[in-house]
A protein has these predicted regions:
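Active-site catalytic pocket residues across diverse enzymes, especially alpha/beta-hydrolases
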Residues: 274
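Phosphate/diphosphate-binding loops
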Residues: 277
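Internal maturation/activation junctions in enzymes
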Residues: 280-343
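Noncatalytic scaffold domains of N-terminal-nucleophile
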Residues: 15-37, 41, 47-206, 210-212, ...
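Flexible, polar/acidic helix-loop-strand segments at domain edges
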Residues: 265
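Bacterial N-terminal signal peptides
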Residues: 1-9
Length: 343
């Protein structure tokens, strides 16, 4: 069976009010019980872990749009039955007409919309690594969009926090506010008929169903009429790519992560530094302080991920050892200064 980690972790429990669920052929964990149940259903229907991941991801796009909508980006890491590790990069890309010197510096709105990668990434995963047809894998997502689902407290709360932004645009007002113009409350039944139609088209046509044809035209028309620069060519030319896999080792365990835009290299660097600490000897306060210091010093290396020489450096054990000693020396220096000052 394939193993996968996609923006969320696939898995599950016997109780439907949990975010994980368990079946006879595997475990699925996601941010929503309906997504986890969808993954288990696929496993028990003969699908593999990739099929389950894709099913769960599409359900999340329905029931948790604030965190997992199809308008975002995706990265996935996959372990094949032969042990080979592969990655998928479906990152959001900037439109062809984007100019950093003249483009508005907004934090949200139509001018900030790039080329979404989630659909291309999920279809690539399904096509290259899945076993079941895409229309079968997407059945539950379409069902919940068409017939409705009860919104959970977390999603309701996040949409409430974004109400000011939601009210600024006709599309978001239509789909994320009720008939009275209020946010949906926890337990409300939310039906997304238009989104169900979109998902059906994707399930029948794959990538082209979203990045070409009627859906693409509707997206581009809406974006351009409201100040965005996305074009039909931007969508049509988008491709999810194979992602570079980075590998390390932590206390005897192999660690596999992904290259940019994931911070996989920083994750390995953090683990390499942590491997020099005797964590069992630390009390709770020391443990928290140590982790904070390690994360802080590793995050300073984020720009180094872009270049091959510096990438190799931050992945190296020797570099991690130097950083470990610099943290120890800094801690000793602070302790000495405190003692001299009578603290």
């Amino acid at each position: 069976m394939y193993c996968i980690s996609v923006l969320f972790i696939i898995s599950c429990t016997n109780k439907s009010n949990k975010q994980f669920d368990q079946g006879k052929r595997g475990v699925v964990s996601s941010a929503h019980p309906l997504a986890s149940e969808a993954g288990i259903k696929i496993l028990e229907s003969g699908g593999n872990a990739i099929d389950a991941a894709v099913a769960s991801a599409f359900v999340l796009s329905v029931v948790e749009p604030s965190m997992s909508g199809i308008g975002g980006r995706l990265q996935a890491i996959v372990k094949l039955p032969n042990g080979e590790i592969r990655g998928v990069d479906a990152s959001t890309q900037v439109p062809e007409k984007y100019d950093s010197n003249t483009h508005p510096k907004n934090s949200y709105g139509y001018s900030t919309i790039g080329i979404p990668g989630v659909v291309a990434g999920l279809v690539k995963l399904s096509k290259e690594y899945g076993e079941l047809p895409l229309d079968v894998v997407m059945e539950d997502a379409i069902h919940y969009a068409e017939n409705g689902y009860k919104i959970l407290p977390g999603e309701s709360y996040r949409q409430m926090l974004a109400k000011d932004q939601i009210e600024k645009f006709g599309g978001t007002k239509k789909y994320f506010l009720d008939e009275k113009g209020e946010n949906f409350s926890s337990g409300d039944l939310v039906v997304q008929s238009d989104f169900a139609k979109t998902l059906k088209i994707i399930s029948e046509n794959g990538k082209s169903g979203f990045y070409d044809g009627e859906i693409a035209k509707n997206i581009v028309d809406d974006v351009q009429q409201n100040g965005g620069i996305l074009t039909l060519d931007d969508l049509k030319n988008y491709e999810a790519k194979d992602s570079r896999v980075l590998s390390g080792n932590y206390r005897g365990y192999d660690v596999h992560t992904l290259f940019l835009p994931s911070y996989g290299a920083i994750t390995i660097e953090i683990l390499n530094i942590l491997s020099h600490f005797n964590i069992d000897e630390l009390d709770q306060v020391e443990w928290v302080k140590m982790f904070s210091d390690v994360f802080r010093i590793a995050y300073l290396d984020r720009p180094k991920q872009k270049y091959e020489d510096s990438l190799e450096l931050i992945l190296s054990k020797d570099y991690a050892k130097k950083l470990f000693h610099s943290l120890k020396e800094s801690k000793a220096s602070k302790r000495t200064n405190a003692e001299l000052n009578g603290e």
